[in-house]
Amino acid sequence: MGIRAIVVDTAGTTTDLTFIQDVLFPYSVKALPDFLAQNQHNVLVENCICDTRDIALEPDADLARVTEILQQWVHEDRKATPLKTLQGLIWKQGYAHGEFTGHIFPDFIEAVNRFSAQKLRIYSFSSGSVEAQKLLFSHSDGGDLTEMFSGHFDTRTGNKLDKQAYANILNTISLSPKQVLFVSDVVEELKAAEAAGMMTCQMVRDSKQRTGDFRTINSFDELVID
């Protein structure tokens, strides 16, 4: 049967965690107040504001309070969909203005070209929004990589720690579990993917990283698909 598609996690796998934590997250925290004030009547932004009130169980929260809630969620690394959607919109402005470029490990840039040449389908699955993933890969240090991807998945597909999210991916891409390899640095995500029947491989870029009972690699250079 063989592997026909590779699904990659982003932070810690294709992208340095420090870029997310030290560049993207602080940028979104700083930009949130002005962005919400200027765009609160945009339909998408307005929906995110309403969803934030619902999730926080604060239906009467004013814009200042909504901003506080969202900023707190960033500090807590909450995977709330309205936050991730707003971060994607904010980062879009940052990329467009040249505030930063998307960090991608060089070994993944090489590998994505290799996998594409092998006619393998490549997908990303992140708690960051699909929009944020597209921005990361289109404004990467290695240029625009988006044409190499067959698709992207985010929290709308499901929680990355939940088996059902991976079952949903399989249903969307119409492949059997053993035809799909999921690569992540997070043990719990790999367990969920394995429970859905996917093949798995753990990316271990940090020697102090917690590992599980999975095949491990230290870079995509070591990932060879026959």
UniProtKB/Swiss-Prot annotation:
Gene: mtnC
HAMAP family: Salvage_MtnC
Reactions catalysed: 5-methylsulfanyl-2,3-dioxopentyl phosphate + H2O = 1,2-dihydroxy-5-(methylsulfanyl)pent-1-en-3-one + phosphate
UniProt keyword annotations, A-Z: Amino-acid biosynthesis, Hydrolase, Magnesium, Metal-binding, Methionine biosynthesis
Family: Belongs to the HAD-like hydrolase superfamily. MasA/MtnC family.
Native source organism of the sequence: Shewanella sp. (strain MR-4)
Cofactor field: Mg(2+)
Free-text cofactor note: Binds 1 Mg(2+) ion per subunit.
Pfam families on file: Hydrolase
Function: Bifunctional enzyme that catalyzes the enolization of 2,3-diketo-5-methylthiopentyl-1-phosphate (DK-MTP-1-P) into the intermediate 2-hydroxy-3-keto-5-methylthiopentenyl-1-phosphate (HK-MTPenyl-1-P), which is then dephosphorylated to form the acireductone 1,2-dihydroxy-3-keto-5-methylthiopentene (DHK-MTPene).
PANTHER family: ENOLASE-PHOSPHATASE E1 (PTHR20371:SF1)
GO biological process, one term: L-methionine salvage from methylthioadenosine
Involved pathway(s): Amino-acid biosynthesis; L-methionine biosynthesis via salvage pathway; L-methionine from S-methyl-5-thio-alpha-D-ribose 1-phosphate: step 3/6; Amino-acid biosynthesis; L-methionine biosynthesis via salvage pathway; L-methionine from S-methyl-5-thio-alpha-D-ribose 1-phosphate: step 4/6
Alphabetical list of Gene3D superfamilies matching this protein: 1.10.720.60, HAD superfamily/HAD-like
Any GO MF annotation of the entry: 2,3-diketo-5-methylthiopentyl-1-phosphate enolase activity
Official protein name in the record: Enolase-phosphatase E1
Oligomer status and interactors: Monomer.
Enzyme nomenclature, EC number: 3.1.3.77
Source lineage: Bacteria, Pseudomonadati, Pseudomonadota, Gammaproteobacteria, Alteromonadales
Enzyme class: hydrolase
